[in-house]
């Protein structure tokens, strides 16, 4: 008969956070706060950090000299790629940082439904989405908003469609022609 069993997991979402607390003295001392993290264990992860002391660079502190601190965490996670994202009060800045290396043109925020439309150029679309949707999936977990990625052309078409619908509604409700609507 066997005794108690202990199951250990390196795939737990908070495991990476604990490794950063161990490797980065500024986090351990409370000068830098981990706001959120998202992992695809064994493949890629994102961690969002904020400096409590504004004189500190939270991303630089987590990376360390020549990447020594982040490399120690990467080695512990068997080569998992880690993106360190600078946190901001402005959610559009955070999502732009989280979707790096893609360059974001515009972010439309829908607070009530916790959704975002991220608008970028056609060239940046695949960078933002990532391999098999990994980049956008991790960014979604990181900021806790549903992210809808669209090109500037798609956004323009969506706006035109919304305008057309509103105009038709106005015309129908007020019983006026198109020039007044």
Question: Can you say where each PLM-predicted feature lies in the sequence?
Answer:
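RNA-contacting regions in translation and RNA-metabolism proteins
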Residues: 1-181
């Amino acid at each position: 008969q066997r005794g108690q069993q202990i199951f250990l997991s390196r795939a737990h979402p908070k495991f990476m956070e604990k490794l950063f607390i161990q490797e980065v003295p500024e986090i351990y001392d409370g000068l830098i706060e981990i706001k959120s993290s998202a992992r695809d264990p064994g493949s890629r992860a994102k961690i969002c950090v904020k400096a409590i002391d504004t004189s500190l660079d939270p991303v630089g502190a987590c990376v360390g000299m020549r990447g020594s601190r982040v490399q120690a965490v990467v080695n512990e996670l068997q080569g998992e790629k880690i993106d360190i994202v600078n946190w901001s009060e402005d959610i559009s800045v955070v999502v732009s940082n989280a979707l790096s290396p893609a360059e974001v043109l515009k972010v439309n925020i829908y607070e009530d439904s916790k959704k975002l439309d991220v608008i970028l150029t056609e060239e940046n679309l695949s960078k933002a989405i990532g391999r098999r949707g990994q980049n956008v999936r991790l960014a979604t977990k990181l900021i806790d908003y549903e992210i809808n990625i669209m090109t500037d052309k798609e956004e323009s078409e969506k706006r035109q469609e919304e305008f057309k619908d509103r105009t038709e509604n106005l015309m129908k409700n007020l019983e006026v022609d198109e020039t007044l609507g």
